[in-house]
């Protein structure tokens, strides 16, 4: 396990230095990860919603949000406030308990996944040794909430949307997990920190996208399907199902689905950046930069600069992938449900299995290049 920045230890030690007891410091830490996670995820969503509106407008030769704040940057905030004050309506024949639990079960695992994703040089809330497995386990809870919402709404369109969403999620969960296993096999670890560190040796040439091109394509297609982005937005196909499992939702319950969708998109882009694009690593290795300037890697100003650049690089890679996902929305037509399931079960799953076996063979044959 890499011994980098530990937010928990640093936070508790800072409070102890201020004169608080260790027990009180640990108690004060308990709500901190959740608050930090919610703030980071919410800010990421606001930026993503604004980007989607502006990119969509550009694709359609419109201006987009312009007058709500500078360049319309306050438009996403206005959307959120509008939903906050909307009436929360529960259909007369719906199951009130399941109807309320559905959005919560969908939203909570997405937020919890941010606990194990690094935003910079070892800057992670919880550096778990099984971080990737935890994320896969959390993401597999979502279909239960989607089915619950579709069933509890007592609406045929909602039920069909929930069934489609569950089928889609299950179909693409397996290829996604196999693609991640190939990366974990090369990195000899399931920790997100260790996976990024393993890509740090040769700059851009050391990133996993070059050693796992098939895995990268499989993972990117699978996360787009998991996020229900076009061309895989069949659970919400307006022409067929009105709004799918969200049809009967209003107010804050609908806002939870809206929020979870964009939080999941940012999270998926972050994970692609971490697993395949070197995370916080810059295209040029730090060793090369320090040699150019003739300074030691342990020089404080170089370490601070490198840590700051790491956060910037992570966000740049993440929002580049968000940009591509938004652009795909206006580029590709929606696939049919049979095409969607055929792609997952008959193409991505066999290719993901072949990719995993190929990775194992290359790891044994060329251990230096494939993390042996």
Curated annotation (Swiss-Prot):
Catalytic activity, as annotated: a plastoquinone + NADH + (n+1) H(+)(in) = a plastoquinol + NAD(+) + n H(+)(out); a plastoquinone + NADPH + (n+1) H(+)(in) = a plastoquinol + NADP(+) + n H(+)(out)
Role summary: NDH-1 shuttles electrons from an unknown electron donor, via FMN and iron-sulfur (Fe-S) centers, to quinones in the respiratory and/or the photosynthetic chain. The immediate electron acceptor for the enzyme in this species is believed to be plastoquinone. Couples the redox reaction to proton translocation, and thus conserves the redox energy in a proton gradient.
GO biological process terms held by the UniProt record: aerobic respiration; photosynthesis, light reaction
Entry's localization field: Cellular thylakoid membrane
EC number: 7.1.1.-
Keyword Manganese attributed: no
Organism listed in the record: Trichodesmium erythraeum (strain IMS101)
Protein name stated in the entry: NAD(P)H-quinone oxidoreductase subunit 1
